[in-house]
């Protein structure tokens, strides 16, 4: 019960400090306790062979699925391995976590890798944290698209992942379109310029992307936000704020996102912001 700390905190705060203020203070302290217990609590993994923290399970599941997707194309190439290594660098994994990630990637390449079981266990470990689960699917989509294309086997694996965490076909296709547009949009000059102006995360290597660098694409910007070209300013702003709320790094961290994954969350927020800014600039909106 992830709210037990809040309940206990309310009664203790009410007794110690008196009144509603004391109860609210107790709820806040209890919330912090619930969060820490959730982060430190171990989860059972029949696949990785030991009890893990949720953060470790997130990281190992990510690389195991990446290995499975790489194998789906027939054989794992040196490019696939290099892309996995680049992701480890982007996540700034220490030596111990790099070793775990490599082991998970190798496990995912096995012919009998139980994809649905792995994702189901991950879903259960995340509980009701839908934003965290959606972000996990996005990470897999981004990684799979790093070579500039998605074949039918890769798409089927991605849909299996999305379906297992409870997404519909429509939700999956919408998210995939948004992710692919973000990849295209990110390869354009506007995103690089925006990121450099913000002192952002362009120090990392993105050699795996093979999209054309033809500058900003307004249609991709619309797709990044999941909106139509003719939507009014208020509708665009609502979509932008909703996505920024879902991808806020601090909020994802509070729901169990590993520290190592924060860089990807920040990059996603940058993409959303850059797309919104380009739309506003094109439309002449303030």
Swiss-Prot record:
Coiled coil: none annotated. Residues 32-286 are cytoplasmic. Residues 1-6 are periplasmic. Its main location: membrane. It holds the Pfam family TerB. CDD domains: DnaJ (cd06257), terB_like_DjlA (cd07316). Residues 220-286 form the J domain. It is found in: Cell inner membrane. It is a single-pass type III membrane protein. GO terms for cellular component: plasma membrane. GO terms for molecular function: protein-folding chaperone binding. The keyword Metal-binding does not apply. It comes from the Bacteria. InterPro entries: DjlA, DjlA_DnaK_co-chaperone, DjlA_N, DnaJ_domain, J_dom_sf, TerB-like. SUPFAM superfamilies: Chaperone J-domain. Keywords: Cell inner membrane, Cell membrane, Chaperone, Membrane, Transmembrane, Transmembrane helix. The chain crosses the membrane at residues 7-31. The transmembrane domain is a dimerization domain. Homodimer. Regulatory DnaK co-chaperone. Direct interaction between DnaK and DjlA is needed for the induction of the wcaABCDE operon, involved in the synthesis of a colanic acid polysaccharide capsule, possibly through activation of the RcsB/RcsC phosphotransfer signaling pathway. The colanic acid capsule may help the bacterium survive conditions outside the host. This is Co-chaperone protein DjlA. It comes from Haemophilus ducreyi (strain 35000HP / ATCC 700724). The gene is djlA.
